[in-house]
Amino acid sequence: MKIGLASLAVVLVLHFPQKSDQPVPVEEEPLHKVEFKNDAVTVMRLILPPGQYTQYHIHTHDRVAVQLSTTSTTQQDWKKPEGPANPVKPGDFAAMTLEGNSYTHRVHNVGKEPYEVIDIEFAQRPTAPSAELAAPVAAENPSSRIYHWVLAAGATAPMHKHVRPYVIVSVTTLNLQMNSPDGQTAARFVEAGSFRYVEVPPGGSFTHNLANIGGTPGQIIEVEMK
């Protein structure tokens, strides 16, 4: 049986995934933008327009996701059907544990608004995790713990101590003030979705609290390495 060139081209397209469909490391996925990276963590921001998919991408570390938008998404693991829609809103978070050597998937924004998320990936799991907690743990994986602060206007979180480096994420726009036990204060206006990596040297610590000195409610998430 003879097969024409046009028919052969169709067969090749159907049976061999195109280059754009092949998984890439998450840092190379076009919509995942690396905004901070050091030897300990990589912080990426994904903004996915409504109706669009990311490229299939590969995660090779434990990670934390902090949601910054109100929409719905689906997850599709490599070579598996697309999963159900999952609504998200600002302040939702998840601490994900890598099972095996890697995890490959893509994300589909099935909502009507852009999907924005901060993805924090940890270079390696600690050989000796810290047993000291800064606050009640909202979620954790083998590499990190999440502390979630919901601050009404004028509210102050309890004083707490970090003994490991951490990433502080502002879920909402607010006027934030940090106070230390010796009376020092530092205030700044932070925008929704902004973050900062805070270094805590081995054997050291950093004690502070968080105060919302503005007139609207705020949310802060601290992601502390173990």
Predicted regions and their residues:
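Glycine- and acidic-residue-biased ligand/ion/polar-headgroup-sensing regions
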Residues: 60-79, 163-182
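Asparagine-centered strand-capping/turn motif at beta-strand->loop junctions
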Residues: 106-111, 160, 208-214
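Short acidic-glycine-tyrosine-enriched beta hairpin
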Residues: 36-40, 78-99, 183-202
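Glyoxalase I/VOC metalloenzyme domain signal
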Residues: 20, 101, 112-116, 120-127, ...
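Bacterial Sec-dependent signal peptides at the C-terminal "C-region" and cleavage site
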Residues: 2-25
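A short glycine-rich, His/Asp/Glu-containing loop-to-beta-strand
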Residues: 29-55, 60-65, 131-168, 223
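Surface-exposed beta-loop interaction hotspot
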Residues: 97-99, 104-153
